[in-house]
A protein has these predicted regions:
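A glycine-rich phosphate-binding loop feature that marks nucleotide/adenosyl-phosphate handling sites
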Residues: 16, 61-72, 261-276, 376
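Non-catalytic, well-ordered alpha-helical segments in soluble enzyme domains
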Residues: 241-258
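Intrinsically disordered or highly flexible coil/loop and linker segments, enriched in small
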Residues: 5, 19-26, 54-61, 160-163, ...
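Short, hydrophobic/amphipathic alpha-helical patches that form generic packing surfaces
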Residues: 44-51, 246-251, 375
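A glycine-rich, hydrophobic/aromatic-adjacent loop/helix-cap motif
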Residues: 8, 13, 17-140, 327
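Alpha-amylase-like alpha-glycosidases and glucanotransferases acting on alpha-linked glucans and related
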Residues: 229-238, 242-246
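Flexible glycine/proline-enriched surface loops and loop-helix/loop-strand junctions
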Residues: 1, 26-32, 224-233
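A cross-kingdom feature strongest in bacterial/archaeal respiratory oxidoreductases
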Residues: 74, 98-234, 270-434
């Protein structure tokens, strides 16, 4: 009735799940977690695993990439952390949105902050933020006596807000708003937000910079550190993102404070030493080979497996919930948002709400019966690699029309396509009342 899958198929899946030792694996969640009410299947997974005995042999919720790799020598854990680099690396990565400023705006609300202030919102939206932050109420702008101000300038080194995030059209309107006196972009290409910038500083591509990088997220099975050496000299007057910021810092009299007097090579060596890589390779050999593969620790099999301690002794190994136990009924949500229809204390099917009414049961489905799933592009990561001509030659990457334009592919179920007389290679318009 709701999803078009026969009842007996759903029951068969449930029985199959229950009868077998089951783990649930993700990378970043995919389209399952990129839509309305996506938190409900995520929470339901936890309940299903609880019914299996979470933490027991073969019953885990895990990421299939780097956090599941065997521990390497020298790192101490699967997540690199060095106290001496905390302020420069860990803090900005984990909580960029509130790292230094008094005032913050989630990236998904920038257009609203410009066009429809003042704003109130719960949680700052920072990556890997504390669970409790979702119950903190923020406002924009802050009162002036607390350092609040409206937005007058925008500086972007990733000018793809229009394509890669929500409300692209509203973002265009916001960037053209007279309140915004100046937009600075640094980028190798004239992409998206660059079209609305007052000044564009040419940035290097990856092939034009010297760096030191880790390689743990690309499907490999070992922790690898690479010394990145530029393949070509910078094109024209382009500079690396670091050099762009450094030049601006110099103009503001902050150059020495920003660079600490260190060259790019100095910074490479600093990372090398802070990661204690000299235990595995000398700097000279690292500079010559340009990589080192960290060996897997001999005792990696002794590491704690998932939530095994909680499974074996939940009283002495509580998990980070108010009760320390698995909660089918969320005490946090019950305390802060007991009447939330979109995210109730216990996960369940949510048919519709004031914010989202996208089901076949909605009145809108009479005029717009198809549901659009906006997955990542098959041959790129968001907009990255979209400009590679080789990729565009792939049949499922772009659809070339009579006008010579390469259109984005639209995948339609054969039955829906046939009923609309749509054939492979046709150009279609996807629209609704918005």
């Amino acid at each position: 009735e709701k999803c078009g899958v026969p009842e007996w198929t759903i029951k068969a899946l449930a029985r199959d799940f229950a009868e077998k030792t089951t783990s649930i694996l993700h990378y970043m969640g995919g389209s399952m977690f990129r839509g309305p009410y996506s938190h409900e299947p995520a929470r339901l997974e936890c309940i299903l695993l609880a019914m299996q005995g979470l933490g027991g042999p073969g019953v885990h919720q895990a990421q299939i990439s780097y956090t599941g790799m065997p521990r390497a020598k020298g790192l101490g854990s699967t997540r690199f952390f060095n106290p001496s680099l905390s302020q420069r690396l860990t803090k900005p990565v984990q909580t960029t949105i509130r790292a230094w400023g008094k005032q913050l705006i989630p990236k998904t609300m920038i257009h609203d902050a410009i066009l429809n202030p003042p704003l109130e919102f719960w949680g700052n939206g920072g990556i890997e933020e504390r669970v409790e932050d979702q119950f903190v109420k923020y406002e924009y702008p802050l009162p002036k006596d607390k350092g609040g101000t409206d937005i007058r300038m925008m500086w972007t080194d990733t000018p793809c807000r229009i394509t890669c995030w929500n409300y692209g059209n509203e973002t265009i309107v916001a960037e053209r708003n007279p309140q915004i006196e100046f937009i600075l972009a640094q980028h190798p290409w004239l992409e998206n937000d660059c079209l609305y910038a007052d000044m564009i500083l040419p940035a290097n591509t990856l092939l034009e910079v010297d760096d030191i990088v880790t390689n743990t997220r690309q499907g490999i099975q070992h922790h690898t550190i690479n010394l990145q050496t530029k393949a070509i000299e910078p094109v024209g007057e382009s500079k690396s993102d670091y050099e762009v910021v450094l030049e601006i810092a110099k103009k503001l009299g902050k150059g020495e404070e920003f660079s600490e007097g260190k060259s790019i090579r100095d910074l490479q060596q600093e990372v090398f030493h802070n990661m204690e890589l000299e235990n595995f390779i000398s700097w000279d050999d690292f500079e010559k080979n340009q990589y080192v593969v960290l060996p897997t620790a001999e005792d990696w099999e002794d590491d704690v497996v998932g939530l095994r301690p909680f499974y074996e002794d939940p009283e002495n190994n509580p998990i980070p919930t108010p009760s320390g136990k698995l909660e089918f009924y969320s005490e946090r949500i019950d305390k802060h948002y007991p009447d939330d229809l979109e995210r109730p204390p216990i996960p369940k099917w949510v048919e519709k709400s004031a914010m989202h009414d996208e089901r076949l049961s909605s009145f809108r489905s009479n005029a717009y019966p198809l549901l659009l799933m906006s997955n990542h592009g098959r041959w790129r990561m968001q907009s990255q690699c979209d400009d590679i001509t080789w990729c565009r030659e792939i049949v499922t990457c772009k659809v070339k029309a009579w006008d010579g334009y390469l259109y984005e592919p639209c995948w339609i179920h054969p039955q829906d396509a046939e009923s609309r007389d749509i054939k492979d290679g046709d150009i279609v318009q996807v629209f609704n009342e918005r």
